[in-house]
Amino acid sequence: LKTDCTHLLFLDSDIRWKTPEILRMLAFVEEAPVLCGVYPKKEINWAAVHAAVMRGVPADQLKHHTATMVVNLIGYQGAVAVPGDRPAEVLNAGTGCMLIARHVLAAMAPHVDTYVTDTMPIGGGTIQNGEVILEFFKTSIDPETRHLLSEDYHFCHVWRSLGGKIHVAPWVALGHFGSYLFEGEFLKDT
């Protein structure tokens, strides 16, 4: 909030993405001010691979059925119907690809913890010693479920507790670099 930027975009360095898909996210910022691309965890979901084999998925297509995606759905009951060209509401998603409108951060600011820095910047850093930092992203425990919330899920939890919504962009196809390129498709793997 120290600048006049209108959005904050997280794109992790280990995420493979396509520019047109990311730019398209901006078209939905009014209806979906927190909009995420869904990407696979760095693991192979062997149960999903087995299920795909049993359904007769060709060997050259199995890589699209290996993923456990970094997203949690609202009221998931085993079947997902998401329009592929519109944002879809979810419980939470990862910051590996997350677009946040400035007004979201401004609305959250009075409701997040703060701390004061105690380090001196080296090399002309922008954060000064003694500056108050807003802690939008931290780990926490969900008071209802007692689940551990990672930094990205904590952010989503706080925004939802203030009446906001988290959306995903199903048209964004992301890969996650690890020991190899983990791939998956949100509509197929959830």
What are these regions (language model features)?
Residues 1-2, 157:
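Short, conserved alpha-helix that lines the donor NDP-sugar binding/gating region
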Residues 3-4, 30:
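Active-site charged/polar residues at nucleotide-handling catalytic sites that mediate phosphoryl
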Residues 5-16:
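Short beta-strand-to-loop acidic/aromatic patch adjacent to the donor-nucleotide binding site
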Residues 7, 32-34, 166:
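Short, Asp-centered acidic motifs that coordinate Mg2+ and/or phosphate
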Residues 11-13, 38-40, 171:
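Active-site-proximal beta-strand/loop segments in catalytic clefts of secreted hydrolases
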Residues 18-138:
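Conserved catalytic core of nucleotide-sugar-dependent glycosyltransferases
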Residues 110-190:
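C-terminal catalytic/acceptor-binding lobe
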